[in-house]
Amino acid sequence: MPGKYAEPDGKILLAFINNDLIGGVALPPLEEEGVCEMKRLFVREKWRGQGVGRSLTKQILNTAKGVGYSKMRLDTEKRLDIAIKLYQTFGFSEIDQYYDNPLEDILYMEIELT
């Protein structure tokens, strides 16, 4: 896929069961050296609560480490409690806003990839 998700610095991971797409997550680089972003994590409603989001998060973190990134950032809506708890279990912590975003009620998070 072209654009910011293009390899070698960007990645897209998709989860399938019986050829049905059930989830995915993307990894674009940020301008800051060694920093990437987790974007577009989604799990289809039927498959939520079954570890798909956790598996995709683990895989994208490992992928980012393999590419050589030292930090990963993300943004999420503050109302998405389940997603925020998931990110916290992996070690993400809240940071200041890191890009210009017109949306309100957004939480920004970061993790060191060591």
Show which residues each predicted segment covers.
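C-terminal "cap" of GNAT-fold acetyltransferases
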Residues: S70-T114
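Structured loop/turn residues at beta-strand edges in well-structured enzyme cores
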Residues: D20, V67, E104
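Conserved G/P- and acidic residue-centered "switch" motifs that form tight phosphate/ATP-binding loops
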Residues: G51, G68
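Residue-level signal for short amphipathic helical patches enriched in basic/charged
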Residues: E33, V67, D75
